[in-house]
């Protein structure tokens, strides 16, 4: 059985209102109103440099058992893991808001091949205030760290699936026609990603107890509930008012927080899905096994 022996996150307790962020970025009241309509209220932002927080998070990992490291970043920036041991490191980037799923796919296959523990580090930060605020949404800070193993697995990875078809390749500066094409096709492409992932392991959508999605705003998941014919209350977005979106890592935070709050129980099968603007998508299906952290 392969999966996460340990999966943990570090999210700031410092919550900044979207009013403060919109004012700092000199954005309009219309944009603020759209953010509120999408369910956003506060965004978690580290007061310290995220690299310092990363070191604190990594201090909880026993590196003597780690034989490989995958670093997943949508927008790459230099980080120093300050390792005492020599451990092979692979860094992947791109696929904004979906890269963590590719990191899991890579790390899981690596673990299966060498039968040794692999560390996944998923970390992103906005390089400026205008990069934090994006298309009526706002990005919060988080660090996700997981140890993939075939021993003492707590979160069994059943399947991962990543795909891309890029409609708008320059973000909010893309041609308006490309942006509109992306928005028209996005719900169906998210559904296709989910269905293809389920097919890999011969599951149906009704086998999934909860969907934990990317959370730029609520409206996309109101639509997806209808597109998937899946209960909206089982598409878990209740924490969005204190997270906004967390790049590729928000679905994992929502999942782990739901475990902490007793919503997810042993044996539950969940689907975590991230849809990036422009045309990248990733999803991971997990069975919660429970056990030691």
Please describe what each predicted stretch is.
Residues 76-77, 86-115, 135-137, 151, ...:
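Claisen-condensing/thiolase-fold acyl-transfer catalytic domains that form or cleave C-C bonds
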Residues 38-52, 92-93, 181-183, 244:
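Acidic/glycine-enriched edge-of-secondary-structure segments
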Residues 5, 72, 119-124, 272-275:
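Short beta-strand segments
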Residues 1-44, 130-188, 192, 196, ...:
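Condensing-enzyme catalytic core mediating Claisen C-C bond formation in acyl metabolism
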Residues 46-62, 99, 103, 107, ...:
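Stable alpha-helical structural segments in soluble proteins, enriched in small hydrophobic residues
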Residues 114-117, 130:
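Membrane-interface helix-loop-helix junctions at boundaries between adjacent transmembrane segments
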Residues 78-79, 98-101, 126-130, 166-169:
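Short, well-ordered, mixed-charge alpha-helical segments that flank or form enzyme active sites
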């Amino acid at each position: 059985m392969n999966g996460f022996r340990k999966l943990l996150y570090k999210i700031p307790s410092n919550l900044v209102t979207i009013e403060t962020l919109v004012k700092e970025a000199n954005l309009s009241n219309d944009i603020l109103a759209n953010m509120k309509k999408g369910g956003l209220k506060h965004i978690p932002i580290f007061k310290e440099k995220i690299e310092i927080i990363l070191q604190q998070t990594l201090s909880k990992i026993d590196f003597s058992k780690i034989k490989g490291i995958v670093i997943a970043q949508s927008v790459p920036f230099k980080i120093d893991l300050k390792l005492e041991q020599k451990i092979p490191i692979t860094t992947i980037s791109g696929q904004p808001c979906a890269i963590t799923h590719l990191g899991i796919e890579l790390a899981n296959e690596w673990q299966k091949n060498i039968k040794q523990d692999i560390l996944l580090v998923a970390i992103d930060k906005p390089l400026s205030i205008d990069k934090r605020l994006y298309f009526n949404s706002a990005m919060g800070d988080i660090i996700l760290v997981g140890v993939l193993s075939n021993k003492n697995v707590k979160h069994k990875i059943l399947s991962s699936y990543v795909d891309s078809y890029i409609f708008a390749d320059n973000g909010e500066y893309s041609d308006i026609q490309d942006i509109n094409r992306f928005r028209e096709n996005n719900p169906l492409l998210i559904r296709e990603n989910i269905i293809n992932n389920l097919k890999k392991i011969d599951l149906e959508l009704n086998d999934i107890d909860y969907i934990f999605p990317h959370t730029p705003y609520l409206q996309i998941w109101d639509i997806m509930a209808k597109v998937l014919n899946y209960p909206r209350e089982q598409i878990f977005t209740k924490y969005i008012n204190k997270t906004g979106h967390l790049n590729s890592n928000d679905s994992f935070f929502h999942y782990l927080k739901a475990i902490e709050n007793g919503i997810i129980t042993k044996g539950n099968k969940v689907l975590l899905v991230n849809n990036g603007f422009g045309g990248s998508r990733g999803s991971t299906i997990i069975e919660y096994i429970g056990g030691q952290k």
